[in-house]
């Protein structure tokens, strides 16, 4: 049994090292899934195209079934040395070599070792893979299997499970194990060390390709994760996957344990942050100090986001470190205004908020309201900082504050935000509204007005985002009573929508179309199944003939 566990651990190492062989298996050194195609779906298909670095390939790349080979090698009682060489006690991630010297040598390494192993197994009467002369069995432009590989993300649930794991020993702090994964390069000691409260995304240092001695992201991630999983397995503690499918198969990911209520991950981050427009050094004078700051409730947004990269897409740093008023090369010249207000980007404030109003509880109203711009809308987020006048802000007084001081200013701004006033007294809201001004073939419709208002209020609940923007008592009413001032007694629909459609006023539907468009559209967006759009008599009974 002990030998069986040992072989399993070696199988995991084989899985890790083959996957991360930058320049060994992938010509581009990435963990891209192979193109979709017919046949068996596998998460372990790896594209071998290392020869591509020396020029155009003569034959198609090889679709290598890694988990299948891992199982076979383990079954023969072999370990990683069957495919990987070592130097100074460290195993190379390249296949049967330490360096890439020439195209001819690389070709010989693959053919001699892969085909050689297959041939030896065939001589022993065992099931094996393609042999000499069966080139297209491996170099097949249409492999028999198709990739089901799915990228794995390190969301806050998975992150917390690692933070809370007693199997991952603390490094540098008896109470925290952050240093087991997070590190920075210390120039003085020439070592990787943990930077407390400076933990960053892996992508902050590790990109798609290796740079100097810094490995690419896929190499760094697989090396760290799989080796840690193997070390933990040696202690007989619960550990993570050690093969391709364990992480990258969709069915495996669907079974991951999910922590629903994740405690806040502590990185020394502020509860509240002050977002200031930072002009670039070369910004024109008129671009400086022209916008009021935004108090950002960082703690509340942490609870809503799935991971830090939801907002911090590369480095965990302030937005304005890259996105200045006039843009920087690091931000690909995406200016601060675009970074915060781009309506179709999930990484901008406005873009993320737009997805929230598309949820069924909000879409009934917001799906019908056309986006507009006004100074009043800007003023919901952009407000004056208490204790600082416009001249002080323009002179850079807020920018010159220490981080802790800016956080305090932001907190005071958040606490001073106007509280939502809810809606009008429910006793003043009609319980039912009889809609019968155009009743003809059908009887008037009894509209459960107060019930619908209560449903909308319940849908908002304690939502802070809704509370921030639904300030006035009549805000909620304007989902239906649109294009008129918020009021307890808004104009009737017929005030704007004529009973017959007026072609000369083609900017608005007639009354019948307005009712049906508003009611049916709301039901569709809120996914209300009954009454169905075709069930006329569910809303207004048919008149007796």
From Swiss-Prot:
Keyword Hydrolase part of the UniProt annotation: no
SUPFAM superfamilies assigned to the protein according to its UniProt record, in alphabetical order: Multiheme cytochromes
Binding site residues for heme c 2: 69, 114, 117-118
Record-level GO cellular component terms: periplasmic space
Binding site for heme c 14: 482, 493, 496-497
Binding-site residues for heme c 15, renumbered to this chain: 519, 522-523
Sequence positions that bind heme c 13: 449, 477, 480-481
Residues given in the record as heme c 4 binding sites: 159, 178, 181-182
Name of the protein: High-molecular-weight cytochrome c
Organism of provenance: Nitratidesulfovibrio vulgaris (strain ATCC 29579 / DSM 644 / CCUG 34227 / NCIMB 8303 / VKM B-1760 / Hildenborough) (Desulfovibrio vulgaris)
């Amino acid at each position: 049994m002990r030998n069986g566990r040992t072989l399993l651990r070696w199988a995991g190492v084989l899985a890790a090292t083959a996957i991360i062989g930058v320049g060994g298996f992938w010509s581009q050194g990435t963990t891209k899934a192979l193109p979709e195609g017919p046949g068996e779906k596998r998460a372990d298909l790896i594209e071998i195209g290392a020869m591509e670095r020396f020029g155009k390939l003569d034959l198609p790349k090889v679709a290598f079934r890694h988990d299948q080979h891992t199982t076979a090698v383990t079954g023969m009682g072999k370990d990683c040395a069957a495919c990987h060489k070592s130097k100074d006690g460290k195993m190379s991630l390249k296949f049967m070599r330490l360096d890439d010297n020439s195209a001819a040598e690389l070709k010989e390494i693959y053919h001699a070792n892969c085909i050689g192993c297959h041939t030896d197994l065939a001589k022993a009467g065992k099931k094996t893979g393609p042999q000499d002369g069966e080139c297209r069995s491996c170099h097949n432009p249409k492999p028999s299997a198709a990739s089901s590989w799915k990228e794995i993300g390190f969301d806050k649930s998975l992150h917390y499970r690692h933070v809370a794991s007693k199997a991952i020993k603390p490094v540098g702090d008896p109470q925290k194990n952050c240093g087991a994964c997070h590190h920075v390069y210390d120039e003085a000691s020439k070592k990787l060390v943990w930077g407390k409260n400076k933990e960053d995304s892996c992508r902050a240092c590790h990109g798609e390709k290796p740079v100097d001695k810094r490995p690419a992201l896929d190499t760094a991630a697989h090396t760290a994760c799989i080796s840690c999983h193997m070390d933990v397995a040696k202690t007989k503690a619960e550990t993570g996957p050690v093969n391709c499918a364990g992480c990258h198969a969709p069915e495996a990911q669907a079974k991951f344990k999910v922590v629903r209520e994740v405690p806040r991950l502590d990185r020394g981050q502020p509860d509240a942050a002050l977002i200031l427009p930072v002009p670039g050094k070369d910004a024109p004078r008129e671009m400086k100090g022209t916008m009021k700051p935004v108090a950002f409730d960082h703690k509340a947004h942490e609870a809503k986001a799935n991971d830090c990269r939801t907002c911090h897409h590369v480095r965990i740093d302030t937005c304005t470190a890259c996105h200045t008023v006039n843009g920087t090369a690091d931000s690909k010249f995406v200016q601060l205004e675009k970074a915060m207000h781009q309506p179709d980007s999930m990484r901008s404030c406005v873009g993320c908020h737009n997805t929230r109003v598309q949820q069924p509880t909000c879409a009934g109203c917001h799906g019908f309201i056309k986006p507009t711009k006004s100074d009043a809308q800007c003023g919901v987020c952009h407000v004056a900082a208490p204790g600082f006048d416009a001249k002080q802000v323009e002179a850079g007084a807020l920018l010159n504050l220490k981080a802790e001081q800016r956080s305090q200013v932001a907190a005071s701004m958040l606490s001073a935000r106007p509280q939502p006033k809810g809606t009008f007294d429910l006793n003043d809201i009609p319980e039912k509204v009889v809609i019968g001004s155009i009743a003809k073939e059908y009887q008037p419709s009894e509209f459960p007005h107060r019930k619908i208002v209560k449903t909308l209020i319940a849908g908002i609940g304690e939502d802070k985002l809704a509370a921030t923007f639904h300030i006035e008592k009549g805000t909620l009413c304007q989902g239906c009573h649109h294009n008129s001032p918020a009021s307890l007694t808004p104009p009737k629909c017929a005030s704007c929508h004529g009973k017959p459609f007026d072609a000369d006023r083609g900017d608005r539907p007639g009354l019948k179309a307005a009712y049906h468009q508003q009611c049916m559209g709301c039901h569709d967006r809120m996914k209300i199944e009954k009454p169905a759009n075709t069930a006329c008599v569910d809303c207004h009974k048919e008149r007796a003939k």
